[in-house]
Amino acid sequence: VKAVVLVGGEGTRLRPLTETVPKPLLPLMNRPFLHRVLDHLGEHGVHEVVLSSSYLESTFRTFLLERHGDPTVTWITEAEPLGTGGAIVNALPHLDDTFLVLNGDILTDLDLSAMVAFHRDHGAAATISLARVDDARPYGLVATRDSRVLEFREKPAEPVPGDINAGTYVLDRESLAGWEPGRMISIEREIFPGLIESGAPVYGFLSDAYWMDLGTPEKYLQAHFDILEGKLLGLRYPSPYRDDTADVDLQAHLGRWVVLGEGVTVGPNAEVDDSVLHAGVTVGPGARVLGSVLGHDVVVGARATVTGSVLAEGARVDDDAEIADARVSAGRVAGRERLTERPL
């Protein structure tokens, strides 16, 4: 089995982190998230993966040069963004008659082997992974009967439970016949509805697997906390989790839900809680970092407070400054005046 991983999005809701690093390459437990996606595919016998993007392509090429082992990766350069469906159509020359599609920003422990078997057993043209949620307002609903998808419903106005598209697919090559390569296509809004309208067998694979879209800072943090809590099959880490090279002063305090990257320094009387700190971050003496994501090489000055914020690579917070609900771009310096910027 081969697979396509969709990595072309710009990750606008995760800015400013994604201004310099594409979302699939942001660290998850101190490794680029795409490693986890590829490892998951390899665990289920996938031997070749196709990636394509037009956004920050050089960063993906560096990642691929540094990655070793299965599955092997074929890279396709998109001259311009092609959308979720366009990227798949463009990859068809490299794929088998039946193949997997994963979103490069979704963390899951879904049993991919079972999903492929379900697809084949039902003679499906397309199979969509489904997750059951208590509140479908952010997603929209997928209506099924006996696992066959009947329609996609708009996001409900009121909080209602239901099944949603969880972003992993099994497709037959024939399901994409007639779609022209090289143009913008949405698999969710064009390809799937078109298949259903034509009467093609589209099925939903409902499971209780873990599922999280890493598209916002809040969900990015929550994914780390869920891993620390042991909610994902096969992923076990101590809590708090710190890289072996992290230097934490004996008088510093780390909360339970904390991840510290390579070379992080936390000074005396500093406090870090409910936060993820990427490689090279420095937290000065007496500083507090709460509910925040700090990108590579961020410096938080002595006695400064950072709460509910996202600081991009190389940002600095002056001594005694207070940062709340802020988005601080790469290399920017936040001064002693209280900085409050509502999230994007």
Question: What is each stretch, according to the model?
Answer:
Residues V1-V5, R13, L26-A114, T144, ...:
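Conserved N-terminal catalytic core of the sugar/cofactor nucleotidyltransferase
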Residues V276, V281-L344:
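Glycine-rich hexapeptide-repeat left-handed beta-helix
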Residues V46, D96, G123-A124, A200:
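Short, high-confidence coil segments that cap the C-terminus of an alpha-helix
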Residues H122-R132:
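A short, conserved acidic/glycine-rich loop-to-beta-strand motif
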